[in-house]
C-alpha cells in the first residue's frame, strides 16, 4: 500500500552564510522595534531557539508559505507570547503592545490571530515548560481575538450610525464632505466621539467589556454628539415618526436612540451619566442642565434629564479636548499589551489590511474561513445536524414578539441587542425564587429540596459570575454587573426547571421527581446552560465558553444531556440563542466530548469494556466533580488571584446522586435538527426539520435516565445498561452529524451516491470497530481520511489537496483540523517512529489511519464483502407489485432538508432549498434579497413560514398580475410525485473492480 509523501520544508538559504535566525530575530527586535531590555530579549530568544525547528517544519503552512513571511509571523508570535507571559516588570517590556509588533512585522491583526492558534498548538508543550501549565489562561489569546472582533463590529456600527445621523464635516473649516465618497469619517466630531467611547471602555466598563454594555456606551456617545454638534450638521429628521419618539410636540432624544438601536432606556441614561462625568473629569468642562440653559441646539427636543456642556464642540476647544482624550487613553493603556484601539479611527490602517476584518470577517477562535463583513449580516451556509428541536417564535401576552420584528440587518451588535431585549422583557420580570408551581414539585420529593435548590443556584452562579474574583481590578460596577447577570441566569433556570418538571411529571404520571431533583449534576448542567445563554446574550470577552464548564465542575458530555431539553421547554428562547445552543452541541459532538477528561469515557468503559485499557493508558477518564462546599470555599476566597478549582476538589462519594460520572441520558427520539455553527452569522437556511410527525411515534426523553448510574439497567429494556444506551444514543448523533458533513462534501466534490455511501459506511465501521481513532481527535479528521481512502480504493483521481481545498469552504472548517492531528507515538514504539504530538493530516493518514482501517477499507471496496452485500440487484420480475424502476434502498440516512418538499396537498407543488454549490455562486450581498431560503427570515426573528407571503407581496405589490397558473390543467407539465421520487436517487452505476489502494505522492495543501 503506497503512502503519501510530503515535500520537505526548504532550509533558509541565508543560514549558509552564517546569518542565523537568531541574528535576524535580534535585528528585528532591536532595530525594528527598538527594544533594549536584555532580560526580556533573553526570554524571547530562548523561546525562539526552542521552537525554531517547528518553524522550519511549518513554513508552507504559515501565511502564503514563503520563508520570509513565516519568519515574520514566528517573530511576532514569540514576542507577543513572551510579552503576555513574562513576569518581568521592566518599563521597556510594558511599553510593547501587539500593534507595535505587527507594524514592525508588516502583518495585519486578523491574519495574526488566524495563524496564532496554529503556533500555540505547535509550541504548547514548550510554553508549558517555560511558563507553567496555566499559560493558556494567562495568554488569553481567544479573549484578545474576541475583543478585536467586538471592537471591529463596534467601529463599523459607530461609523454607520455617525454617517446616518450627521453630515461628515471638519470642525475647523465647517467644510461638508461627500458622505458617499468618504473612505473614512474625516471629522473632528467623529474622532472626539470615538475617543470618548474609548474613555468609557477604559474607565467605566473595564473588565466587563461586553458587546451589550459597549453598545450602550456607543449610543450614549451618539447622544452627546447630537446634543452638542451644531444642529445644521445633523441628518436626524425629528419628524420621522418611525424612528423618533415624541413626547408632546417635542422629540425624546434618549427614547428615540433606544428605538433606533435597541438599547435599554434605563441603562442608556446611566451610561450617559457616566460619559458626562468623564467629560467633567478629563476635559474639565462644567456641566449644566439642558432644561436650565436651554441651548438653541436642542430646540424641539425634550431636555429633561439631559446635560449640556457649554462650548464643548466649539472650534477653540474641540482640538484641545481631542488632545486630552488621546493623552488620557495613552496613559491608561501604556502598561497594557493588547490593541491600540485608536487604530479603528482609520479604516485604511495597515493593521486592518485586506486580509483582516475590514475586508473579510473571520470566524472567531481560529477559523480561517474568511467572509466579508456584510456576510455577518447576510446569510451564510449552514450544515444540518441531528441535534436539538426548533421552536417557532412565540407571541406573549404582553405583546412582545420574541426578538421583535426589526428592520435592522442582523449583525453581531444588533443580534446582541435584540437578545438582550428578550432578557429584559421576558426573563427580568420573573421572580428570583421558585414559583408556586415549581415549589409544588420541590416539596413533593421524599424531602423538601427547595433550600438545596436555591442554595446550589446561588453558589454555582456566584462561581460563574464572581463579585470579587478580579482582585484589585474589581469595581462597584463590576459587582453590580455580576449581580445582574446572576439574577438573569437564576430566573431563567427556575423558569426552565419548572417546565422540565411539568413535562417529566406528565410522562411519569407522578409529581414525585426525587431522583431527578436531588441529582447534583443535573442541576449544575441546567445552571450552566442558563448562565451560558446570559453570557452569549451579553457577548462577554473574558468569559468565553467553556468557562461555564470549568466553573461548575461539569464536562462537555454532561452539558450535552440538557441542551435539547432546555431548547424544547423554553419556547420564548430567541432564534439566535437557540442557534447558539445548537452550535454548542455540535461543537461538543465534533471534538469536545472526545477530549481528555470527558465524562463520556466514564460511560464508554462500562458500555465497551474492551476499550477500558486504552482509555486508562491515555488517562482520558473524567475527574469527579468538586463538591458544592469546595466551590463555595472557592467563591469566598477574595485575596488576589483565585486558585485553580482543582486545588479545592472534594471528591463526592461514589453513588451519591446515582453516580456523578453518569452516562448520556436515554433518548429514543429520532432527532434531525440543523445547527448554525457561528453565532456571528445568520444562516441562509437553518433546514430545521418538522418533528411533528415524529413526536407521535417516539416518546420524549426521560431526564431521569440521563443522569442515572452507568451500571443501572436501562428503562428502555433490552438488557442494556444505562451506559450502553447512552453510548448508543451518543454514537447515533455522531453518525448523523457525520452524514450531514459527508453530504456537504460530496456535493462540493461532485461525487456519486456510491462514493457517499462508501464514505458513510467506512465512518460507521471506524466508529464502532476502531473507536480509539476518535480519542483526542476531531471527527472531521476521520472524515477527511475516509474520503481519501475511499477515493483510492474506488480509483478516483481525487487528491488530498482537492479534499482539503473543498473542506476549507465548509462552514465548520478550522485550519487546525487538517494541520494539527493528535498522534500518540508511544503506541507506535514497535515501529521505531517518533515525532511531535500533533502532525498534519497526511502524516496521520499514513502513520495511523491506514494501518488501523486497511481491513475495513478492503471490506467496502468494490467487490468487497460489505459493498457487495449492500448492493441489491434490480429485480427483473416484479411479483410484489412494486414499480420496477423504484430506486434501491440507500444505506445513507435520509436528509429531508436536501430534498424537494411538497407544499400543497391538492397540487403537485414542491419547494427545494438552494443547494450549496449554487448558493456560493448566486448569493452575494447585493443579490441575496432576490432569494427566499429555508430558515432565513425577511425580518429578525420572524417565522420563516411567513417569508413566501412577504416576498410575494413585495414582488407583486407594484405591478399588475397578467395571469395566473392553472393548476387544474393536466397539460401544463407539472412535475409529478413519481418523477420527484425517482429524482432523489442516483441509479446504480458501474465501478472499478480493483480493490487495491493506489495512493499517489502529493503535497498537503496548507
UniProtKB/Swiss-Prot annotation:
Q: Where is this region: Disordered?
A: 866-898
Q: Where is this region: Domain B?
A: 725-855
Q: What are the boundaries of the region Domain A?
A: 411-604
- List the SUPFAM superfamilies hit by this protein, alphabetically: Cyclin-like (SSF47954)
Question: Which keywords, in A-to-Z order, does the entry hold?
Answer: Cell cycle, Nucleus, Repressor, Transcription, Transcription regulation
Pocket: region residues: 411-855
> Carries keyword Cell cycle?
yes
- GO MF annotation, one: RNA polymerase II transcription regulatory region sequence-specific DNA binding
The identity of this protein, by name, is Retinoblastoma-related protein
* The organism of origin for this protein: Scutellaria baicalensis
Gene, per the UniProt record: RB
Amino acid at each position: 500500500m503506497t503512502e503519501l509523501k510530503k515535500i520537505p520544508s526548504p532550509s533558509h538559504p541565508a543560514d549558509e552564510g552564517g546569518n542565523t535566525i537568531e541574528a535576524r530575530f535580534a535585528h528585528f527586535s532591536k532595530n525594528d522595534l527598538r527594544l533594549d531590555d536584555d532580560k526580556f530579549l533573553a526570554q524571547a530568544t530562548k523561546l525562539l531557539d526552542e521552537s525554531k525547528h517547528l518553524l522550519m517544519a511549518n513554513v508552507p503552512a504559515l501565511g502564503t508559505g514563503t520563508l520570509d513571511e513565516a519568519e515574520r509571523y514566528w517573530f511576532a508570535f514569540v514576542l507577543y507570547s513572551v510579552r503576555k507571559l513574562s513576569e518581568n516588570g521592566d518599563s521597556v517590556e510594558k511599553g510593547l503592545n501587539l500593534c507595535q509588533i505587527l507594524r514592525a512585522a508588516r502583518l495585519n491583526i486578523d491574519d495574526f490571530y488566524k495563524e496564532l492558534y496554529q503556533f500555540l498548538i505547535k509550541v504548547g508543550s514548550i510554553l508549558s515548560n517555560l511558563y507553567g501549565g496555566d499559560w493558556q489562561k494567562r495568554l488569553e489569546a481567544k479573549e484578545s481575538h474576541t475583543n478585536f472582533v467586538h471592537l471591529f463590529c463596534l467601529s463599523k456600527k459607530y461609523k454607520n450610525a455617525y454617517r446616518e445621523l450627521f453630515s461628515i464635516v471638519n470642525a475647523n473649516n465647517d467644510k461638508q464632505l461627500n458622505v458617499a465618497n468618504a473612505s473614512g469619517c474625516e471629522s473632528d466630531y467623529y474622532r472626539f466621539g470615538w475617543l470618548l467611547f474609548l474613555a468609557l471602555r477604559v474607565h467605566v466598563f473595564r473588565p466587563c467589556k461586553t458587546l451589550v454594555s459597549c453598545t450602550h456606551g456607543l449610543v450614549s456617545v451618539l447622544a452627546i454628539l447630537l446634543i452638542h454638534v451644531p444642529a445644521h450638521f445633523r441628518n436626524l429628521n425629528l419628524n420621522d415618526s418611525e424612528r423618533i419618539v415624541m413626547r408632546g410636540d417635542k422629540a425624546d432624544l434618549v427614547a428615540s436612540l433606544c428605538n433606533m438601536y435597541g438599547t435599554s432606556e434605563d441603562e442608556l441614561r446611566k451610561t450617559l451619566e457616566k460619559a458626562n462625568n468623564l467629560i467633567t473629569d478629563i476635559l474639565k468642562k462644567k456641566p449644566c442642565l439642558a432644561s436650565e440653559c436651554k441651548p438653541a441646539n436642542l430646540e424641539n427636543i425634550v431636555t429633561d434629564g439631559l446635560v449640556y456642556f457649554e462650548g464643548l464642540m466649539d472650534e477653540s476647544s474641540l482640538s484641545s479636548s481631542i488632545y486630552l482624550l488621546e493623552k488620557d487613553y495613552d496613559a491608561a493603556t501604556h502598561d497594557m499589551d493588547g490593541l491600540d484601539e485608536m487604530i479603528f479611527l482609520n479604516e485604511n490602517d495597515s493593521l486592518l489590511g485586506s486580509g483582516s476584518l475590514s475586508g473579510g470577517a473571520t470566524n472567531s477562535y481560529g477559523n480561517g474561513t474568511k467572509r466579508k463583513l456584510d456576510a455577518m449580516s447576510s446569510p451564510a451556509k449552514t450544515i444540518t445536524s441531528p441535534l436539538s428541536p426548533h421552536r417557532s417564535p412565540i407571541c406573549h401576552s404582553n405583546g412582545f414578539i420574541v426578538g421583535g420584528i426589526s428592520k435592522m440587518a442582523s449583525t453581531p451588535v444588533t443580534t446582541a441587542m435584540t437578545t438582550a431585549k428578550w432578557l429584559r422583557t421576558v426573563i427580568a420580570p420573573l421572580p428570583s425564587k421558585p414559583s408556586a408551581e415549581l415549589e409544588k414539585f420541590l416539596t413533593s420529593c421524599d424531602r423538601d429540596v427547595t433550600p438545596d435548590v436555591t442554595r446550589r443556584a446561588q453558589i454555582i452562579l456566584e462561581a460563574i459570575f464572581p463579585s470579587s474574583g478580579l482582585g484589585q481590578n474589581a469595581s462597584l460596577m463590576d459587582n453590580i454587573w455580576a449581580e445582574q447577570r446572576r439574577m438573569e441566569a437564576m430566573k431563567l433556570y427556575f423558569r426552565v426547571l419548572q417546565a422540565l418538571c411539568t413535562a417529566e411529571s406528565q410522562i411519569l404520571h407522578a409529581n414525585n421527581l426525587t431522583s431527578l431533583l436531588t441529582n447534583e449534576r443535573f442541576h449544575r448542567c441546567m445552571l450552566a446552560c442558563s448562565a451560558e445563554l446570559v453570557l452569549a446574550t451579553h457577548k462577554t470577552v473574558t468569559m468565553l465558553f467553556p468557562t461555564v464548564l470549568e466553573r461548575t465542575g461539569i464536562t462537555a458530555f454532561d452539558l450535552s444531556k440538557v441542551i435539547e431539553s432546555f431548547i424544547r421547554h423554553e419556547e420564548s428562547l430567541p432564534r439566535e440563542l437557540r442557534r447558539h445552543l445548537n452550535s454548542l452541541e455540535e461543537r461538543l459532538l465534533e471534538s469536545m466530548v472526545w477530549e481528555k477528561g470527558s465524562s463520556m469515557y466514564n460511560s464508554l468503559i462500562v458500555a465497551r469494556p474492551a476499550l477500558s485499557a486504552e482509555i486508562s493508558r491515555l488517562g482520558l477518564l473524567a475527574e469527579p466533580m468538586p463538591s458544592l462546599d469546595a466551590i463555595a470555599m472557592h467563591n469566598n476566597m477574595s485575596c488576589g488571584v483565585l486558585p485553580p478549582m482543582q486545588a479545592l476538589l472534594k471528591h463526592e462519594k461514589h453513588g451519591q446522586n446515582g453516580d456523578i460520572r453518569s452516562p448520556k441520558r436515554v433518548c429514543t427520539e429520532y432527532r434531525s435538527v440543523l445547527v448554525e455553527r457561528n453565532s456571528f452569522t445568520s444562516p441562509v437556511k437553518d433546514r430545521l426539520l418538522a418533528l411533528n410527525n415524529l413526536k407521535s411515534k417516539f416518546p420524549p426523553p426521560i431526564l431521569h435516565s440521563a443522569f442515572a448510574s452507568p451500571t443501572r439497567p436501562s428503562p428502555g429494556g433490552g438488557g442494556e445498561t444505562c451506559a450502553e444506551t447512552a453510548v448508543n444514543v451518543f454514537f447515533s448523533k455522531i453518525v448523523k452529524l457525520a452524514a450531514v458533513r459527508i453530504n456537504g462534501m460530496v456535493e462540493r466534490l461532485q461525487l456519486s451516491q456510491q462514493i457517499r455511501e462508501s464514505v458513510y459506511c467506512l465512518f460507521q465501521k471506524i466508529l464502532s470497530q476502531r473507536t480509539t481513532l476518535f480519542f483526542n481527535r476531531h471527527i472531521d479528521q476521520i472524515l477527511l481520511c475516509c474520503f481519501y481512502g475511499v477515493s483510492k480504493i474506488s480509483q478516483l483521481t481525487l487528491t488530498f489537496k482537492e479534499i482539503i481545498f473543498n473542506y476549507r469552504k465548509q462552514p465548520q472548517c478550522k485550519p487546525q483540523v487538517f494541520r494539527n492531528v493528535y498522534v500518540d507515538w508511544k503506541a507506535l514504539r514497535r515501529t521505531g517512529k517518533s515525532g511531535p504530538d500533533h502532525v498534519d493530516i497526511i502524516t496521520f493518514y499514513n502513520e495511523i489511519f491506514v494501518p488501523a482501517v486497511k481491513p475495513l477499507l478492503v471490506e467496502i471496496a468494490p467487490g468487497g464483502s460489505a459493498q457487495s452485500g449492500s448492493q441489491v440487484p434490480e429485480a427483473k420480475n416484479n411479483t410484489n407489485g412494486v414499480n420496477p424502476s423504484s430506486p434501491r434502498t440507500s444505506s445513507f440516512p435520509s436528509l429531508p432538508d436536501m430534498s424537494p418538499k411538497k407544499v400543497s396537498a391538492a397540487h403537485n407543488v414542491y419547494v427545494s432549498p438552494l443547494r450549496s454549490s449554487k448558493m456560493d455562486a448566486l448569493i452575494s450581498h447585493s443579490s441575496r434579497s432576490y432569494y427566499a431560503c429555508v430558515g432565513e427570515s425577511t425580518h429578525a426573528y420572524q417565522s420563516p413560514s411567513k417569508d413566501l407571503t412577504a416576498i410575494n407581496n413585495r414582488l407583486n405589490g407594484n405591478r399588475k398580475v397578467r395571469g395566473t397558473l392553472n393548476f387544474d390543467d393536466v397539460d401544463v407539465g407539472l412535475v409529478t410525485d413519481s418523477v420527484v421520487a425517482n429524482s432523489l436517487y442516483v441509479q446504480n452505476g458501474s465501478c472499478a473492480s480493483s480493490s487495491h489502494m493506489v495512493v499517489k505522492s502529493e503535497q498537503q495543501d496548507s
